């Protein structure tokens, strides 16, 4: 199974009681995934596709590999977050994923099924959104060193993207270094739980094609001049 997917999230719409809105963080990731998946069907799968059931439910599980490229918007540009190591904790570009879920198949014709799936992808990383540490207290001084006093440091975007809380920004939207120092880096980021990994839920609608030996003669390359009707069943 090969997939291209986008995941994203942002704090501003969150319930104020969740304490996420003040972080003002967001991300977007567009990734590629390749996985090997096995299915267990409610009704037995027939040897010949022409005799398969018109409707079937199934469970599935598998293992795969996905890219992991979270980005955040700074001005009009989307910046790659992984190379910046905002939390001083490097993570891999490729991650393991474990697809699980349920699905349904409806027989459209001899060679194709309409499929609908509800699936959840488990992972072994907490950095699909580039956010893991509870706050910046352990690395805020490194962020400030890269930023400088007024953004003249060697890598100022690290601090700009790590701290978006408006309480620690100046009137121009730039990090207020003195406020950050006075706070001691106790500025919230993530859960801070090492054992909690990221995952994502999706709904998939697709077409499944059965590549039986007679598909080329009977469906794709059949003589359409002599045969006027389209044969579905």
Would you name each region that the model predicts?
Residues 17-22, 81-88, 185-191:
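Extracytoplasmic loops and strand-loop junctions of Gram-negative outer membrane beta-barrel proteins
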Residues 36-40, 61-65, 100-106, 116-120, ...:
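Residues on the lipid-exposed face of transmembrane beta-strands in outer-membrane beta-barrel proteins
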């Amino acid at each position: 199974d090969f997939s291209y997917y986008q995941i994203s999230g942002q704090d501003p719409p969150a319930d104020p009681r969740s304490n996420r809105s003040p972080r003002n963080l967001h991300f977007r990731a567009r990734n590629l995934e390749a996985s090997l998946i096995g299915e267990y069907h409610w009704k037995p799968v027939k040897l010949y596709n022409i005799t398969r059931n018109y409707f079937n439910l199934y469970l599935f599980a598998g293992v795969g590999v996905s890219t992991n490229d979270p980005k955040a918007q700074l001005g009009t540009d989307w910046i790659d977050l992984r190379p910046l190591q905002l939390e001083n904790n490097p993570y891999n570009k490729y991650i393991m994923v474990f697809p699980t879920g349920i699905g349904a198949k409806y027989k459209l014709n001899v060679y194709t099924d309409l499929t609908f799936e509800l699936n959840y992808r488990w992972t072994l990383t907490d950095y699909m959104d580039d956010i893991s540490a509870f706050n910046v207290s352990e690395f805020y001084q490194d962020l400030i060193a890269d930023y400088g006093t007024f953004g003249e440091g060697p890598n100022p975007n690290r601090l700009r993207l790590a701290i978006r809380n408006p309480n620690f920004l100046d009137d121009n939207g730039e990090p207020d270094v003195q406020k950050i120092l006075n706070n001691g880096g106790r500025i919230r980021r993530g859960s801070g739980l090492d054992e909690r990994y990221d995952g994502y839920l999706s709904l998939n609608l697709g077409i499944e094609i059965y590549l039986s030996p007679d598909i080329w003669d009977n469906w794709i390359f059949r003589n359409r001049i002599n045969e006027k009707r389209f044969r579905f069943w």
